[in-house]
Amino acid sequence: MPDIFTDNTDKQDSDPSRQGFEGQPNVVIVRYGELALKSTGVRNWYEKILMKNIAAMLDSRNIPYSLLRREWGRIFIETTDPRAAEAAADVFGVVSTSPALVTKPDLESAARTCAFLGTGLIREGESFAIRARRSGNHPFSSADVGRNCGDAVWDSLEKEGKHPRVNLTSPDKEIFVEMRQNLAYVYLETVKGVGGLPLGTQGSMVVLMSGGLDSPVAAWLMMKRGVMITPVYCNNSPYAEDAARERAFDCIRQLQTWAPGHQFATYEIPHGPNLRAFIGTCDRKNTCLLCKRMMYREAYEVMKKVGASGIITGSSLGQVASQTAANMHAEIYQLAIPIYHPLIAFDKSEIVDIARRIGTYDISTRPAGICTAVPERPEVKANYDLIVLEEKKLGIETMVGDALKAVKILKL
């Protein structure tokens, strides 16, 4: 493990003598969620991966830091850069972060730090509250911390000529104190994290990437659950414009920003010849179903090649004509392929909200033309056995093999 990492899970905190009170946040508290529920061995592994992912995110945004410390229930980033809290909050597995001031874990030091922050934070007429918690062995309670720190803030405000008010139910301003065994942390804000599990803890999957709104969101949601992705783009040229290809690749590039330290390998598969065969040989209304089944077969071969465990799609039940329950069954009929639909029950508005959050919305809504292979009246209630009969006209195995011979592997 690099020198920037330290493990203090047994000692709980590092030496307070090297910490100084300088009046500005000098550490970021990183909190994680459900990985804390894992067994000791699994939790230890997850935490180490999370630390590496946090370090990679900080490096990708050119945010300096001196150390990452792993302690029981927390990760601490030693930095004075105000961007660090937001950056760490964008790491999968992190539920929240807080830029904090570090001080000694005694009542006097904590009270002095709270008074300093409170004087600059609380304006005339505003109410305040101290939110205190502690861990480790201390000769005082959390209530003692709150009371002593509150008194110090009150006295400091009175010296400033302000008229302080305490409101523990609905205060205008809050000051948080986390008292640990060897250090105390005082902070004013909590930045919400993306949550989930650390990227890379749940293996890898292939994602069918179209560049529309849905597939990037589906990929991101699986990344949030710890899954590394291998994007597969089926190029429908000449039935699709080059703009569609660039849009898909730009979505992949944006997803890459959520996974610093993990380089995607994008597989581009020529799919136009397959569409030409479907249009020329089969009932026109079945083109979309045959197309999707072929994409699954091609993605399955990529899945086996890269050692992945499944295929991710952006399908959402009932969103378009081809995504009826009957059609989605037909798409996998007699195909023993593990398919994941993370958006299956999402409303379009929910998908749009996530796309905006992750930075793919503006890319996915760029004009890119339409696929001209789509029939005027696509099948919405497929006959499963008829689809299989249609495929027997085509020489499916040869088509899959020809497509994979022409695949391009790209680092975008």
Curated annotation (Swiss-Prot):
SUPFAM superfamilies: Adenine nucleotide alpha hydrolases-like, THUMP domain-like. One of its GO terms (biological process) is thiamine diphosphate biosynthetic process. It is an enzyme of class 2 (transferase). Its EC number is 2.8.1.4. ATP binds at L208, M209, K292, G314, Q323. One of its GO terms (molecular function) is tRNA binding. InterPro entries: Rossmann-like_a/b/a_fold, ThiI_AANH, ThiI_fer, ThiI_N, THUMP_dom, THUMP_ThiI, tRNA_STrfase, tRNA_sulfurtransferase_ThiI. This is Probable tRNA sulfurtransferase. It comes from Methanosarcina acetivorans (strain ATCC 35395 / DSM 2834 / JCM 12185 / C2A). The lineage of its organism: Archaea, Methanobacteriati, Methanobacteriota, Stenosarchaea group, Methanomicrobia.
